[in-house]
């Protein structure tokens, strides 16, 4: 998995006044958990989080402080301003290469489902999978091949198993499925109506003609 570097500096004060001053200066107050002792409070420029926050992708983080310390981490929580969507606060959690971590990884579909080619629609139940594994083994995204799915068929999480991570969902969890589209249903209904009309009209005419002939023969 790709890693993004965040350059920051330790916070000398964590009070409300100091936090407000940081935000006014374009800085984001952050906390790193999982370190020895107390959580580490630091701040970094808001623009440095652009490729970490405003993206559908996920990354690990390398936090580098001006004092020289460096930490590997993952984003744990983020708070946004309710009106401006500006980043108010970010929590990180320190990770270690030899210890497994749990993350939500994006799903990328591959191929065109057979059912879609026949008029169906691919519906997603999940866009990300929660998996657990070593940081170095976790992928940037998980590939889900849907090319063999027919209308009515589903792709389960067991279809994207990997030796590199353990999926944290029940085996019967559905990633996506091919369903009949509304247009296809309407078209099939119209075809059935036409068949019913034809079936009602033709046999009725033949029966009426035969009955008329027999009736004429009886009178003679």
UniProtKB/Swiss-Prot annotation:
What Gene3D superfamilies does the entry give?
Ribosomal protein L25, beta domain, Ribosomal Protein L25, Chain P
Q: Which GO terms describe its molecular function?
A: 5S rRNA binding; structural constituent of ribosome
Q: Where is the composition biased (Acidic residues)?
A: 186-199
GO cellular component terms, semicolon-separated? cytosolic large ribosomal subunit
Q: Which UniProt keywords apply?
A: Ribonucleoprotein, Ribosomal protein, RNA-binding, rRNA-binding
Protein role: This is one of the proteins that binds to the 5S RNA in the ribosome where it forms part of the central protuberance.
Indicate the family of this protein.
Answer: Belongs to the bacterial ribosomal protein bL25 family. CTC subfamily.
Q: What is this protein called?
A: Large ribosomal subunit protein bL25
Recall the taxonomic lineage recorded for the source organism: Bacteria, Pseudomonadati, Bacteroidota, Flavobacteriia, Flavobacteriales
